[in-house]
Amino acid sequence: LHSKVGSVGFPIRGVTVSVFDSVTNKEMKYGERGEIRVDSPARMKEYYKNLQATKDFFYTDENGVMWGRTGDIGYVDEDGFLFVLGRASDTFTSKSGEKIYCFDIEAAIWENENIADCEVVGISANGYEIPVAHIIVKEGCESYEDKVIETIHMYCQQKLTEDAVPCGYKICKSFPVKDSGKRDIELIKQDRTNFVVPIGNGILKEISF
């Protein structure tokens, strides 16, 4: 077996990849999610004139192995294939203590055929983190955006845990980007008004956070 759908493959010779709990530094079992870390002779030595960033990047385990933190969330299956799911920064802890992965919510939203793009972020509300979804619908779907949101919300309720169901949805024309061309997630998180949430019978309630 040389490949699997969704996997980035095997580490190359001389490179060791493993998955750890980012809080406890416990090495995860096959199939368990965690932060992907790498040990390689080609790994960088340090951040230039930035001791704190260097300390934050490296983790040395009880065997003296120095792992580099990739900042990516993923898992290794029993056949040794590595799967990268998303960024660790796309994760937050809900009111009940559940670890919520924004990319899981996005995957559920993407299953709707009317979606052109989406971005799910965790925002602070009433002292804890909640997920909200920013959505761009495909051209031609503008006349029934409310129905699209209602359908997505119902699907998320069926597929996701209660804490992972978006608390609000916002239809967008585009997403803000940085000068680098990357999506400006922090700016998206600052957008806290004019969301809607389905409350039944085809009714959408306007909500702000």
Please provide the spans of the model-predicted regions.
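Conserved ATP-binding loop and adjacent catalytic segment of the adenylate-forming AMP-binding
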Residues: 1-16, 26-34, 42-45, 55, ...
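Glycine-centered tight turns that cap/initiate beta-strands
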Residues: 14, 53, 114-117, 174
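Conserved beta-loop-beta connector loops within the AMP-binding
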Residues: 18-37, 75-79, 142-149, 180, ...
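Hydrophobic beta-strand positions
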Residues: 19-20, 59, 75, 110, ...
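AMP-binding/adenylate-forming catalytic core of the ANL superfamily
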Residues: 40, 45-46, 56, 65, ...
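Conserved C-terminal "lid"/linker of ANL adenylate-forming enzymes
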Residues: 119-124, 132-134, 153-209
